[in-house]
Amino acid sequence: MTRDEIVAIFQKTGAMLSGHFRLTSGRHSNRYFQCALVLQHPDYSELLCRELAARFAGDGISVVIGPAMGGIIVSYEVARALGVRGLFAERENGVMTLRRGFSIEPGERVLVVEDVITTGGSVREVMEAVRKSGGTVAGAGVLVDRSNGAVDLGVRTEALLTAEVVSYAPEDCPFCKQGIPAVKPGSRKI
């Protein structure tokens, strides 16, 4: 898929939002990628995640995992495309962990996926959970990298769409200074 084709899907589904947003990282931005609006469409989910999976097809991946919430559908669809298990990690007492009977065997090659990254914090937390389980993090895949490739996760990282989106510390946010309230559209409470 070309970048233009991917952008067209995000635009068609209304997933590229403008306004004043408080991101999961705690930073503020005037743009937000609401991947749930794309992922609600099974055909688009399959198409995008198949493209992401293809980038790791020869890497011997045996498990795909993503953080709840944003990574659940991505994990499932990428795993399906690769023909492997798809898991998700979730927070328990504030720590990303494997629950619900999910496990990773020592030495399994694991691909960590997410819908959007800004700082990579959630992906790093899942990577730590994988390592604690004895798995080997073989790579990371995301639908959207808001950092335009600036985030270094320490493993090969593939993004379907990279975008340089300005974000601000809350104390430096021009929208806050104008009194414009921030919206928190994501799933994680901060």
From Swiss-Prot:
Where does this protein hold 5-phospho-alpha-D-ribose 1-diphosphate?
E114, D115, V116, I117, T118, T119, G120, G121, S122
Q: Which UniProt keywords apply?
A: Glycosyltransferase, Magnesium, Pyrimidine biosynthesis, Transferase
GO process terms (BP): 'de novo' UMP biosynthetic process; pyrimidine nucleobase biosynthetic process
Q: Which Gene3D superfamilies does this entry report, sorted A to Z? A: 3.40.50.2020
- Report the EC code(s) recorded for this entry: 2.4.2.10
* Pathway annotation: Pyrimidine metabolism; UMP biosynthesis via de novo pathway; UMP from orotate: step 1/2
**The reaction(s) this protein catalyses:** orotidine 5'-phosphate + diphosphate = orotate + 5-phospho-alpha-D-ribose 1-diphosphate
> Which residues bind orotate per the record?
T118, R146
A Pfam family of this chain: Pribosyltran
Protein origin, superkingdom? Bacteria
Q: List the molecular function annotations (GO) for this entry.
A: magnesium ion binding; orotate phosphoribosyltransferase activity
Task: Tell me the cofactors it needs.
Answer: Mg(2+)
**Is Magnesium one of the keywords UniProt gives this record?**
yes
- Which PROSITE patterns did the record assign? PUR_PYR_PR_TRANSFER
Purpose of the protein: Catalyzes the transfer of a ribosyl phosphate group from 5-phosphoribose 1-diphosphate to orotate, leading to the formation of orotidine monophosphate (OMP).
- Quaternary arrangement and interactors, per the entry? Homodimer.
Q: Which family does it belong to?
A: Belongs to the purine/pyrimidine phosphoribosyltransferase family. PyrE subfamily.
What this protein is called in its record is Orotate phosphoribosyltransferase
Q: Which organism is it from?
A: Pelotomaculum thermopropionicum (strain DSM 13744 / JCM 10971 / SI)
Lineage per the UniProt record: Bacteria, Bacillati, Bacillota, Clostridia, Eubacteriales
Q: Which gene encodes it?
A: pyrE
